[in-house]
Amino acid sequence: VTAIVEQRPVWTENPPAKEGRMYQVQVDGEIFVAPIVINAAGVYADEIHNMICEEKIRIVPRRGEYRLMDKNCGDLVNSTIFQQPSKMGKGILVTPTVHGNLLVGPTAEDIPDKQDVDTTAEGLTKVLNLGSNSVDALDGRQTITSFAGLRAHLVHEEPAEKSDFLIGEAEGHPGFIDVAGIESPGLTSAPAIG
């Protein structure tokens, strides 16, 4: 998707043909034609959506940082421990992995860069400090690796509007289907979304 966005593809709707409306996507000089376009572009779904839809959406990348602890920490808990959720997400969890390690995180930080999956000292400190609220025996020296990922946070002008899971056909554009703003629980909901 990044290459599509950086190439600024031209999206056009052809007049209805015998088989119905067709969409044309141009990428690197190649043209792809299809009656259905599924926009599942993650943090770039707003840019794809806004190329064709009059009603604009905005997605902000929300970075989540994790620590993976050594296996000698794996017996500190035997089930997933969640903290009190906030408006930013479900909070820092502590959970055992299938390999016997302990996973702690994620943070939730809205950032401007849609490709920034770097971990930060501040974020990893926050993971350890908040994770220690649930499991006080966490020791940062037992961290074997850390990583970050991005969730696609759908921003609305009206705070009362639902802020995730924009799934469906775009108004006025039959066959253009958005699957955008899938935050949490994205993995759990994937089978139902399709």
Residue ranges of model-derived segments:
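Short, surface-exposed charged micro-motifs
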Residues: 3, 15, 33, 91-94, ...
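Glycine-centered tight beta-turn/hairpin loop motif at sheet-sheet or coil-to-beta transitions
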Residues: 27-30
